[in-house]
Amino acid sequence: MAGKTQNKNKLSNDLSNKPESKPKTELKSKPKTKLKLTVQFADARLQKQLPKALIKKSVKAALFFPAELTIRFVDKVEGKALNKEFRGKNYATNVLTFAYTEDDDADVTLADIILCTDVLQKEASEQQKSIVDHTLHLIVHGVLHAQGHDHENDDDAAEMEQLEVSILASLGIANPYR
């Protein structure tokens, strides 16, 4: 997602607020952020394992700005349809983030984060990870995308990965990239 330069500057260690500043990639002390969260289980297979309080905790850990977010769990049919319609890819993917806030001066980050249960379960099994930890990782990943982070080039990917690892550590979740 493009945009959010102003918001990224708020995270920067550079006090000059230059537009080229990068977001902070370490979590030291983060102010509490306002969150309106809706969680939808169109596919309910993970609903018991992922209570809303746990989802909200992971979202808040990754949130640097006030936000209104919907997190929706879908099956592979809906996941594939959304990925095809919006990204031109004819397969289900683990997470899709639809950020609706392009204005750098927006007061609130607005986004829908779609998680495909089938893909999450397959990946967690293949990677020998807990489905809960894997899902929370991808929720954090989606929330970072909603706030303007991306992994389109190697530097941005490394920065986003480092930020994810720090956030997950604050939640007691091991580095998912090891």
Specify the residue positions occupied by each region the protein language model found.
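An acidic/histidine-cluster motif and surrounding catalytic segment
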Residues: M1-T135, A146-R178
